[in-house]
Amino acid sequence: MHCPFCSAVDTKVIDSRLVAEGHQVRRRRECLLCHERFTTFEMAELVMPRVIKSNGSREPFNEDKLRAGILRALEKRPVSMEAIEKAVNHIKSRLRATGEREVASQLVGNLVMDELKSLDKVAYIRFASVYRSFEDIREFGEEIAKLEK
């Protein structure tokens, strides 16, 4: 690690601890040349799988698109941003846990529905109606009946 003060190559770690719920390492370092101290944060670079769309095209996973879809379903619903971020992170974690380089968009959609089902039933129905392309009121009723079981 280069010293940000004198650009020396040699530094030593004085203290290390886990932060951000164990997802980051905070290290306190000291330059061996100028003796200045500084802090670094390290986290693993976790690669998200590519998404295979229903038309067969492939695109990089887009966290903003995921969040926007969830926010659209939860519009004007009493769900905190903290809960939404937790859901987004849980979906990303589950996608990484597949160990696959590519995942079907259907898997992403199903994971979103699982999260919405536990967050807000109305948002779940909203998302399901678009995701599953409900054609009539009967399909809404069937999905609501599944929720009530």
From Swiss-Prot:
Entry cofactors: Zn(2+)
Biological processes annotated in GO: negative regulation of DNA-templated transcription
Transmembrane segments: none
UniProt-recorded Gene Ontology molecular function terms: ATP binding; DNA binding; zinc ion binding
Cofactor note: Binds 1 zinc ion.
InterPro entries documented for this protein: ATP-cone_dom (IPR005144), NrdR-like_N (IPR055173), RNR_NrdR-like (IPR003796)
Pfam families in the record: ATP-cone, Zn_ribbon_NrdR
Record keywords, A-Z: ATP-binding, DNA-binding, Metal-binding, Nucleotide-binding, Repressor, Transcription, Transcription regulation, Zinc, Zinc-finger
unnamed zinc finger locations on the chain: 3-34
Domain ATP-cone as annotated: residue spans: 49-139
Family assignment from sequence similarity: Belongs to the NrdR family.
Function (record text): Negatively regulates transcription of bacterial ribonucleotide reductase nrd genes and operons by binding to NrdR-boxes.
Protein's name in the database: Transcriptional repressor NrdR
Species the sequence originates in: Aeromonas hydrophila subsp. hydrophila (strain ATCC 7966 / DSM 30187 / BCRC 13018 / CCUG 14551 / JCM 1027 / KCTC 2358 / NCIMB 9240 / NCTC 8049)
Gene: nrdR
